[in-house]
Structure formats: C-alpha cells, structure tokens
Amino acid sequence: MKLSTIFTAFAATIATVAGYETTGSKQTVDILIDYIIKETPELSQNDVANWENGDTVTLQYVVNNNEESEITVVGVTGQFKNPVNNEIVTNLTTGKVGPIAVPPGEAIKFDQKINVDLIPANYELIPYVFIAQDSLIKVIPCRGQLATIVDAAVSFFDPRLIFLELVLLITFAGLIYVGYEIWGKQYFKGVASVKAKKVSAAKASSPVASGPSTTSATGYDTNWIPESHLKQKKTKKVN
C-alpha cells in the first residue's frame, strides 16, 4: 500500500466522520487496542484519574493485529465527553502517527500526549485510533477513562504570581510618588512656612532690657522706684 494512498484516505475519512463515528454500516475488526496512562500506570478503566489544568497526560497505546492482513496505524485523536449525558465537550487535536505497519499476529506501541485545559468538572476521555487496511481507513474507539479535572493550586513562588506582585508593588510606589509630587510638596511647604512665622512672632513680642538693672532682695527691679520711697521703706524697717 502506497503511503500517499494511505494519507489521502486518512484525510478523506476525517472529513467525512461526524463526531468520529462512521456514517456507514459498522464493521467488526479483530484489532485490539488498549492503553495505559504513563504518569499513573496503576489506573484501570474502573478508576477515576485526577488531573490538573496544565498537566500533560501521556497515553501509551498497544495495538494487537489479529487480522489476516497487515494494518497500518496512521493517526490518533479523541474526545472529552460529559459522563452523565454523553455529550461531547471537546475534541482532541488529531495527531499523525507513523505510519506504523503492524503485520498479522504482531503488536506495536506508540504514545499520545494530551494537554489538559478544561473547565474543572468530571469527564470521560475516549481515544480513537485511525487504522489503514486494504485501502480503507477505519476509526477504532478505545475504552473510556473517567477523569476529574481541577485547577492547579497557585504557589506563592509561582513566577507568574511573583511577576504580578512586582507589578502591583511598582504601581503602588508610582502612585505614592505622583501623589507626593502633586500634593505632598505643597502641603509640607505650607506647614513649614506657618511654623517659621509663629517663631518670628514669638521672638518679636519678647521684651529686651537695655542697660544695667539691679534687683532687690524682694526679687524685682528697683531702678524705677523713686529714692524717697525707698528711704521711707528703709526707715520703717529700722523702727
């Protein structure tokens, strides 16, 4: 089988498949396809996988060809469905594989990477493998895998969070600087000038004594008292 014929048929099949289900009559094939999740190989079909948005999940497929003729694996895709109502939520990007020829009675392995980015909820992942056989492309569904998807917890040391914190800090510092330049300088200048005026007024109102002055034992200045009055006080004291 020529590779160009395989790829032409593969493209035509994708174009005519609605929801990855063939529009013609279903055919039975003796091709067994299973997979494991490399990150959690212990999970089975009955388990529920727990994934976070941003994770990369690797599916490792095993294709067993029990047909009498050779088959060729040419592509892989898949869907996330709502496990309650079976509605399709999103389709995975169709990926090219190989092509990898599988002779009768033999098996091959290949990987598919899936980037998890969905609204947090419960889903069922159903992969599909494209097989070329006898100039036809066959879409073979694999078992479903239940999964719970949640948002990843944000770490304090996450570079994106650190960058956001720096942006907020710089913005806050810039607002403070602008506020000081517009209102702060004028306010502090006004307060300083008022204090200077109060100090000058206090100095001007203080009396300044000129010339020598004497104080009596009574503790007040006697220069301004007439001498006759002072003599009278002294005479009274002698008596």
UniProtKB/Swiss-Prot annotation:
GO cellular component: endoplasmic reticulum membrane
Presence of the UniProt keyword Plastid in the record: no
Family matches, as Pfam families: TRAP_alpha (PF03896)
Chain ranges on the Lumenal side, renumbered to this chain: 20-161
Region spans: Disordered: 201-222
Compositionally biased tracts (Low complexity): 201-213
Cystine pairs: none
Protein's job: Is probably involved in a pathway contributing to genomic integrity.
The family this protein is said to belong to: Belongs to the IRC22 family.
This protein's name: Increased recombination centers protein 22-1
Taxonomic placement: Eukaryota, Fungi, Dikarya, Ascomycota, Saccharomycotina
